[in-house]
Each structure stands twice: as structure tokens, then as C-alpha cells.
Amino acid sequence: MLIIAQKCKLLSLDTSSSKSGWAYFENAKYKKSGVIDLDTKECKKKYKDNSDRRIEDMCLAVWNLLQKYKPDIIVIEKLNVSRNMNATRVLSKVIGTVYTYYILTDDCSYFEIQPTQWRSQLGMQSGKKKRDELKQLSIEYVKNTLGKDVTDDESDSICQGLAYIKMFT
């Protein structure tokens, strides 16, 4: 496990088949974040009859993001197997793309983090809250910590990175 050090680049990802949030950190400091959005009206039209193509495009977009930032550390939300096997299969392809990048890259660390783990690390009490309430907590945490208004996809990726930094510095 790579400990945050000088000149260290970290990329955290909250992946899905249609919207994947990402956050980039240098030397344990937040720098930039965004969302790969394949859920726009234009994209829905493009992928209407071909969901496999959407997954391929998401995998390529995530790969290109990894190539652009060349992280020393990759933090990604751990896949929770659900009853929806199709969703699990699709998400495993996106996560597999990230894992492949890690395998093929020298001096890169890969860390899977559970949502309960990063929420706990950042002091977010998840308790018996519903999914939408948990997403809102993440959005509010980013607003209060970084002064940045973001979507839940982006806020989750930022929080994952911040939690990793807190855990290993």
C-alpha cells in the first residue's frame, strides 16, 4: 500500500455504467474533479439499442482519464454484488478496466474502499439512512469541506479520495 508522499498523484473513482465521478489529488490536496456523463439526452439516443456500446465507451473514457492523470494511487468504490446480476456484470467491466490499468502500470497502488468505510472515516453517520440521504450527506460534506457544489457522483469520488488520504497520512 502506497502511503501519501511528496509528488504523489491520487485518482479516486465512483464508477457506474452511465455516470462515473472522479477526483484528482496531488500531494494529498484536492485539485480537480468531474463526471463522465453518458446519461445525457444525446447519449441516451446514441445507446438506445446498444447498451454494450455505452459500457465500452465508459471503459474507454475511464481508461483515458487514467492515462491523462497517471495516478500513483487509484481509489475505487468496492463492487457490492446485488440481486441485479446485469448491473453487477456491467459495473464489473468498468472496474475491470481500472484494475487492468493498475496491473499494467509500474509503481501504482490500487485500493478498493467500501461506502461505509469512507463515510465512517469522514464522520458521516450512515445508520439507517436511505440511499438518497447518504448521497446528500456526501454532497454537503464536499460543500462544507471544499466549498464546491457538485453532483452526488462527483461528491462520492471526492469523499473516497479524502477518506483514503485521512486513513494513510
Predicted regions: what they are:
Residues 1-169:
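Phosphate- and other anionic-substrate recognition elements at nucleic-acid/protein interfaces
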